[in-house]
Structures are given as structure tokens and as C-alpha cells.
């Protein structure tokens, strides 16, 4: 069995906004979602004393303080007093964003968080939500208390930190009784969650799923760790593909997608947004934090997605790149994209490429989920977003970069892209590519 899989609902909270419409609108409007670390409310208390490890010049991609739904009645259902005690921030963010995706998909009963069971069988409704780190805040704070004060541990400490508890809490809150599944593949987590849901539906194991990832890992310890690993830029500017790029900006956020078989979506007369047609993945088997210089692993993931979709390289119109603004990573990805997608392409069929991370930073585990949503919106709205802070494009051997159409200054509107690729790569050599198709009817 191999069924077609379509996208029917989207939800996200990002440094650009607390909803899909706000985030997408601000991305297209060249808004910068990055914040100087010195402007954080807890800067003096948590960061200033650690300036040797965390320079005051860095920026972060902070989500809005109040990311909850504007409807207070819905908030009371989503976040009970028990939830406040039992759940950590990445779980609460997942609950909030899942509500938006389910509402966007037209699955919820009016003014409620319950799913209309006349539209779907909850026994076949899967929940696939991952996180790269989980709750570093709870681990850090509980460790301090236990070590310094010998205080009793919160009985919910373990359920608050496990990365699968976003999926667990979402499935409980919305009564999703299909499979509960969670991956943690560093910065590829979101793409893997969506890709796995694609396969579960495609193979007939589930009829419908909510899939994505949540990350709220802005914390002195995580920042200090990434700075020590020389991953983060200390000049505060995320510059994907630029010759002056010097590392990523750490961000947080969440993205959720409702996916279902085409038959299931048509049966309930759903509003179909896009179709997922390919999923590729590979391992670099090279280094724990760096890709091979030639981007071979990323290339193989792209080629696998194309093969699954039964498409030619020239069919792809747009690449939403992982491009985190690191020296080695951006170049390796460009080489992979050029090698996999440029052969046979005529000058009349440009390959557009951009990165969202100039505007939102690197959302770690949630990056692929949020960027997949932006990729889907690019196809739906015929607007391919540009890369913020891209002034001087990197160079590649044999002038391959000249053959890629880097989107700068403003979005590309009216090019009518039909197929778009979203890449996400992670520490440990994880490579993932999702291939989306513009929905033009069955």
C-alpha cells in the first residue's frame, strides 16, 4: 500500500510571532525576530555574571513572552493548573501550537479543544512530536537545588524533561489514540517527525497525524555550550550564505502540521494546503558536529526524496535550505544542492534558494518543522521568502554558486513554484530532505 499524503493544517510560534499568520507575514516583510541578549528580562540575573562565557554582543531568537492563545477560554482548557505544575515550557508550546494546527485543519468542535469525531477516528490519529533538547531549564534548576539545598525532587521532574513528553501530553490533551512517536535527531528532529508521519500514513498505519517539534532551549547553559563549540556567532547577526557568516543565532519555537491520506482528507471535505511527495534521509558518518566538505550526505538525502517522489532534479523550483550561517555547513549544503539539482537544468528554469534563519535564528529541533511550514506557505501563496542579511554570496568551486538563484532583498513573487524542498541537518551527521508539491487539485 502506498497512499498520497496531504497537508491540511498548520500552526507555529516563532521569534517572528505567536501564530502562523503573524510569523509568515513578518517573514515576508523583512522583520528581524532576533533580540539582543542584553534586552532579555533575566539578563542581569542569568547572563551578565557569565559574560566571560556568554558575550553581551550575541542575539537570540526569543519567542513572544505571551505565546498563549488570544482566547482566554481556550487557554483555560489548554493550560489547567495541573498542566502548569506538571509540564515544562517546550510541552506547553507544543500544546498551544497543536491547537492552532488542529483549528486550522477544521478538526475541532466550536469553542473547544475536542476533536469532532464525525470527521476522523481517533484510534487512527497519530501524534509525532520531537524535541532536540527538551527542558534544559528543569534539568539545570533541579540539579542546583538537589546539589546545593538537598531539596526534594519535584515528582514531575522526569516527565517534564523527557523529549517524548510533548507528544505524550498532546495525545492526552486532544485524545489522539493512534501511535505516539517522538524522535530526537538534533536539528533534524522536526523534519524527521514530519517524514515519519508521512511514511506511517503512506503505508496505511495511520489515517491522520499531527507532526512537528518544539524547542525552548534558550538558557545560559545551552548558550555557553554552543559558544564553546564555536557554533554561535558573537556578532549578533545571522548571515546564511554570506561571505561574512560566522555562526548561528540560537532561537526557540514550535511548528505543527496536520497530515492525512488524500482519501481521508477528501472524505471529510478538508481544505488541502499542499502535498508531501518525498522524504529523504542519510548519515554523513563523518564527524559529530561538522558535515563532509563536499556535502555528500546531504546530496544523498535530496536524491532519496526525489526518487521517492519519482521526480527529476529539474522539477524542483525552490530549496528552503538548512543554512545555519556556519562557514562549513552553508558551503557544504550549497555544493549538495548544486550537485543534486543543477544537472540538466536550463537557464530558463532557475533554482531558487533561501534560508529563514537570518530572520528567526536556528530553532534547533524545531527548525525543520517551522521551515517546512514556511516552505508549504511559499507554494500556497506563490511567495518565496528571501534570506535576511545576505549581502555577499559565498563562492563555490567551478562557480557553481553563480548557477543557484539566491533570493536576496525581497521575496520572489509570481514565479509559481510547483515543487519545493526543505532541508534539515543535525549534529551526529543526520541529513533530511522533505519534498512538497503545490496543491492544484487531485
UniProtKB/Swiss-Prot annotation:
Every Ketosynthase family 3 (KS3) domain range: 2-438
Enzyme category, top tier: transferase
Superkingdom of the source species: Eukaryota
Name of the protein described by the UniProt record: 3-oxoacyl-[acyl-carrier-protein] synthase homolog
General function of this protein: Possibly involved in the synthesis of a specialized molecule, probably related to a fatty acid, which is essential for mitochondrial respiration. Is essential for oxygen uptake and the presence of cytochromes A and B.
Signal sequence interval, chain numbering: none
SMART domains named among the record's database cross-references: PKS_KS
Catalytic activity as recorded in UniProt: a fatty acyl-[ACP] + malonyl-[ACP] + H(+) = a 3-oxoacyl-[ACP] + holo-[ACP] + CO2
Lineage: Eukaryota, Fungi, Dikarya, Ascomycota, Saccharomycotina
This protein's UniProt keywords: Fatty acid biosynthesis, Fatty acid metabolism, Lipid biosynthesis, Lipid metabolism, Mitochondrion, Transferase
Catalytic-site annotation from UniProt: 187 (for beta-ketoacyl synthase activity), 322 (for beta-ketoacyl synthase activity), 362 (for beta-ketoacyl synthase activity)
GO CC aspect terms: mitochondrion
Molecular function GO terms recorded: 3-oxoacyl-[acyl-carrier-protein] synthase activity
GO biological process per UniProt: fatty acid biosynthetic process
Family (UniProt): Belongs to the thiolase-like superfamily. Beta-ketoacyl-ACP synthases family.
Note: Present with 1660 molecules/cell in log phase SD medium.
Major localisation: mitochondrion
Cross-referenced NCBIfam families: PRK07314.1 (NF005589)
The keyword Transferase is assigned to this record: yes
EC number assigned by the record: 2.3.1.41
Location in or out of the cell: Mitochondrion
Amino acid at each position: 500500500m502506498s497512499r498520497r499524503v496531504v497537508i491540511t493544517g498548520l500552526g507555529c510560534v516563532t521569534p517572528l510571532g505567536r501564530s502562523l499568520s503573524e510569523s509568515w507575514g513578518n517573514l515576508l516583510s523583512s522583520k528581524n525576530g532576533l533580540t539582543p541578549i542584553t534586552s532579555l528580562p533575566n539578563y542581569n540575573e542569568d547572563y551578565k555574571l557569565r559574560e566571560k562565557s556568554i558575550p553581551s554582543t550575541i542575539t537570540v531568537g526569543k519567542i513572544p513572552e505571551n505565546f498563549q492563545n488570544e482566547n482566554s477560554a481556550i487557554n483555560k482548557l489548554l493550560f489547567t493548573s495541573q498542566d502548569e505544575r506538571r509540564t515544562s515550557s517546550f510541552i506547553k508550546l507544543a500544546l498551544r501550537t497543536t491547537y492552532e494546527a488542529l483549528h486550522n485543519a477544521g478538526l475541532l468542535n466550536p469553542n473547544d479543544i475536542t476533536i469532532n469525531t464525525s470527521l476522523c477516528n481517533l484510534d487512527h490519529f497519530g501524534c509525532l512530536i520531537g524535541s532536540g533538547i527538551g527542558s534544559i531549564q528543569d534539568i539545570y534548576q533541579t540539579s542546583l537545588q538537589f546539589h546545593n539545598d538537598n531539596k526534594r525532587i519535584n515528582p514531575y521532574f522526569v516527565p517534564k524533561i523527557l523529549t517524548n513528553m510533548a507528544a505524550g501530553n498532546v495525545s492526552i490533551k486532544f485524545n489522539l489514540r493512534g501511535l505516539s512517536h517522538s524522535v530526537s535527531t538534533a536539528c533534524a528532529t522536526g523534519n524527521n517527525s514530519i517524514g515519519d508521519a508521512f511514511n506511517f500514513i503512506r503505508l496505511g498505519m495511520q489515517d491522520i497525524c499531527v507532526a512537528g517539534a518544539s524547542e525552548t532551549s534558550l538558557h545560559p547553559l545551552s548558550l555557553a555550550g554552543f559558544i564553546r563549540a564555536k557554533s554561535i556567532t558573537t556578532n549578533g547577526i545571522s548571515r546564511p550564505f554570506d561571505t561574512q557568516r560566522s555562526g548561528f543565532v540560537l532561537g526557540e519555537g514550535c511548528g505543527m502540521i496536520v497530515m492525512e491520506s488524500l482519501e481521508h482528507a477528501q472524505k471529510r471535505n478538508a481544505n488541502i494546503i499542499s502535498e508531501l511527495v518525498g522524504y529523504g534521509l542519510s548519515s554523513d558518518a563523518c564527524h559529530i558536529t561538522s558535515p563532509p566538505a563536499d556535502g555528500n550526505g546531504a546530496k544523498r538525502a535530496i536524491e532519496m526524496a526525489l526518487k521517492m517522489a519519482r521526480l527529476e532534479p529539474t522539477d524542483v523550483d525552490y530549496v528552503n535550505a538548512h543554512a545555519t550561517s556556519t562557514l562549513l555547513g552553508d558551503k557544504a549544503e550549497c555544493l549538495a544542492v548544486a550537485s543534486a539539482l543543477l544537472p540538466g537544468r536550463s537557464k530558463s528554469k532557475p533554482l531558487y534558494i533561501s534560508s529563514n534563519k537570518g530572520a528567526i535564528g536556528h530553532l534547533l529541533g524545531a527548525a525543520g518543522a517551522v521551515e517546512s511550514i514556511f516552505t508549504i506557505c511559499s507554494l500556497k501563496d506563490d511567495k518565496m521568502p528571501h534570506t535576511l542579511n545576505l549581502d555577499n554570496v559565498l563562492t563555490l568551486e567551478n562557480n557553481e554558486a553563480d548557477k543557484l538563484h539566491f533570493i536576496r532583498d525581497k521575496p520572489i513573487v509570481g514565479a509559481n513554484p510547483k515543487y519545493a524542498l526543505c532541508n534539515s541537518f543535525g549534529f551526529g551527521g543526520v541529513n533530511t530532505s522533505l519534498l512538497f508539491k503545490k496543491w492544484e487539485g487531485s
